[in-house]
Amino acid sequence: MNRVILLLSVMCVGVSSQPITENQRLFSIAVGRVQYLHLVAKKLFSEFENSQLEDQHPLNKIFLQDFCHSDYFLSPIDKHETQRSSVLKLLSISYRLIECWEFSSRFLVAGFAERAQVTSKLSELKTGLMKLIEANQDGAGGFSESSVIQLTPYGNYYQSVGVDESFRLNYELFACFKKDMHKVETYLTVAKCRLSPEANCTL
């Protein structure tokens, strides 16, 4: 019996000490960074909402009728399609979303140090995502960095509310930043889970 226990212990140690691949390491870093960005996005959005005046509260409901520019990207429409998407597709969409915000984050109304840190984290995440894309192409064709998409104003849906233009644009930036970081966190979490065949990647 002691020999059996010893053998099982050795086997368990062998399994748990399997070396982490470079792919897994990069995925862990990427997921950690986007989780941080998602938390910051939620914090900034919450602070901005709490700073609203009473007559600006209707903006919350009206925004639900609007769309972020990123909604026009070819991306999964629900959790089922997300789970069926390839790792490369999820990485590519995540890259495009982060690429957009690398520029637009400079216009977030936040403290200078906090805004600079967000932009820096986005740049680091973008670099990491490109490495992951290159590592997971498997002959699926090249990936071009040439199409940088910059976010622009989202329309005039809020004029009837009577809010000024700067408030409307700031609200849209915060709301879309939070929405897009949630998307990227979901996509990268699912893609990372695919590295573990035994794992349950259900959303």
Curated annotation (Swiss-Prot):
It comes from the Eukaryota. One of its GO terms (biological process) is growth hormone receptor signaling pathway. The keyword Disulfide bond applies. It holds the Pfam family Hormone_1. Belongs to the somatotropin/prolactin family. Growth hormone plays an important role in growth control and is involved in the regulation of several anabolic processes. Implicated as an osmoregulatory substance important for seawater adaptation. This is Somatotropin.
